[in-house]
């Protein structure tokens, strides 16, 4: 086994504990107000939120440029830690929407028109997608103290900011309260406005932060789980197609449902990767030589090398070329996703839809059996990874799972301008916040 992978397995190895409460299902041990979470023995994680860019509507040349920049971002991931890219689909909170968008009444004789305008906005919000898509990068590392972890994350923050800026996206650190809000909104869907957490007050009273975010109940069955009044299921990508189009992630997350899709990335140092591929290539060449020797012993001197051995040799050489001449890196990847629904029937229908999308792309998704709790903690943006269904990928093949789709314009106290053609979400713009005030969108 590759040294990097065996080290990560050793570090991730923890004593198995059966959770005795809902709080114990959440794999966070300690939180700090700046957003760093301790998620295991000497394991720290930090989440960054990044904005979407107009990838789906870009020209072919622009798409290639964005794709190459995204490859550079993947190459910049540190070998000493693991990275998780998460796409979070959540329903628009009606209370927050009304607070941010609707015009408040002034009692000046014009409230009739304000009411009509507000009703129009509410109608549009109901007919539109009404889903908000948020994107996160969670970086986790093994450090002895929180000070060492802070130094490491400060360096990672600088690198991520520069790479996302080149892509035309903005990257920002998620603080402790905002990260707990993300988890609360997933665990307690429909109760988003009820979240309130003050870390200082919680410390003073000796309360656990988990009490503020956890659902009422957790019931894990063979192939689904119950979370309060909602049902959920975790899927993972079992088999990958030889060629995957770059719109696969966009199609999977286009569902009008609450879901989280995560891609765990473990980069391997190039020298280790080259040694591993050389070993594999040497093994293939040895098999071919032994096969030819057997044929010669049978006086068959014109035998053609079998197709499978020839294919193994060709693929090993291609992989070696990618690593040595095309500046790509070897990475291990896992794609997991969790989706929730209000009923078991709706959950089964949604699962079938997702499996169909996978089959359409010649990929096979599977439901995790008896691993729903581990799968849930892997798909959530904690930074933990409990599923080991790794796939060896190069930077180029991993970059196909590009998380970008289209940029939504949603300014607080903005004016309704129409509907986004791709995402079907409302365009709410405040011209004072735009780069150019003429409002060309």
Question: What does each model-identified segment do?
Answer:
Residues 1-406:
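Extended, folded cores of ATP/NTP-driven motor/assembly subunits in large transport
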Residues 404-441:
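Active-site-adjacent "gating/activation" loops or surface patches in catalytic cores
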């Amino acid at each position: 086994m590759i040294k990097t992978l065996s080290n990560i397995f050793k570090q991730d190895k923890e004593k198995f504990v059966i959770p005795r409460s809902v709080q114990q299902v959440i794999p966070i041990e300690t939180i700090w107000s700046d957003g760093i979470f301790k998620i295991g023995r000497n394991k720290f994680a930090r989440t960054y939120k990044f904005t979407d860019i107009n990838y789906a509507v870009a020209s072919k040349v622009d798409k290639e440029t964005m794709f190459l920049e995204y490859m550079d971002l993947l190459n910049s991931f540190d070998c000493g830690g693991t990275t998780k890219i998460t796409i979070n689909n959540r329903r628009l909170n009606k209370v927050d929407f009304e607070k941010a968008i609707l015009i408040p009444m002034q009692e000046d004789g014009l409230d009739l028109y304000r009411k009509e305008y507000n009703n129009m906005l509410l109608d549009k919000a109901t007919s539109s997608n009404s889903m908000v898509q948020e994107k996160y990068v969670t970086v986790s590392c093994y450090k002895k103290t929180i000070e060492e972890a802070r130094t490491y994350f400060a360096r990672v923050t600088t690198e991520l900011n520069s790479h996302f800026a080149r892509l035309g996206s903005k990257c920002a650190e998620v603080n402790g309260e905002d990260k707990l809000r993300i988890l609360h909104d997933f665990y307690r869907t429909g109760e988003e406005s009820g979240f309130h957490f003050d870390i200082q007050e919680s410390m003073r009273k000796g309360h656990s932060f988990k009490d503020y975010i956890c659902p009422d109940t957790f019931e894990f069955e063979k192939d689904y789980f119950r979370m309060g009044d909602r049902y959920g299921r975790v899927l993972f990508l079992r088999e990958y197609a030889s060629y995957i189009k770059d719109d696969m992630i966009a199609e999977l997350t286009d569902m009008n449902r609450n879901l989280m899709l995560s891609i765990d990335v473990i980069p391997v140092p190039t020298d280790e990767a080259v040694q591993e591929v050389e070993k594999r290539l040497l093994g293939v060449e040895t098999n071919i030589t032994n096969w030819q020797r057997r044929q010669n012993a049978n006086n068959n001197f014109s035998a053609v090398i079998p197709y499978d051995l020839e294919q193994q040799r060709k693929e090993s050489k291609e992989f070696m070329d990618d690593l040595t001449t095309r500046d790509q890196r070897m990475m291990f990847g896992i794609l997991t996703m969790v989706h929730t629904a209000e009923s078991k029937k709706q959950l089964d229908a949604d699962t079938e839809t997702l499996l169909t999308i996978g089959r359409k792309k010649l990929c096979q998704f599977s439901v995790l059996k008896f691993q729903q709790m581990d799968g849930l903690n892997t798909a959530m943006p904690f930074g933990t990874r409990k599923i080991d269904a790794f796939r060896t990928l190069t930077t180029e093949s991993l970059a196909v799972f590009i998380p970008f789709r289209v940029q939504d314009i949603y300014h607080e106290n903005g004016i309704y301008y129409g509907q986004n053609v791709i995402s079907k979400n409302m365009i709410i713009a405040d011209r004072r916040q735009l780069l150019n005030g003429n409002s060309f969108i």
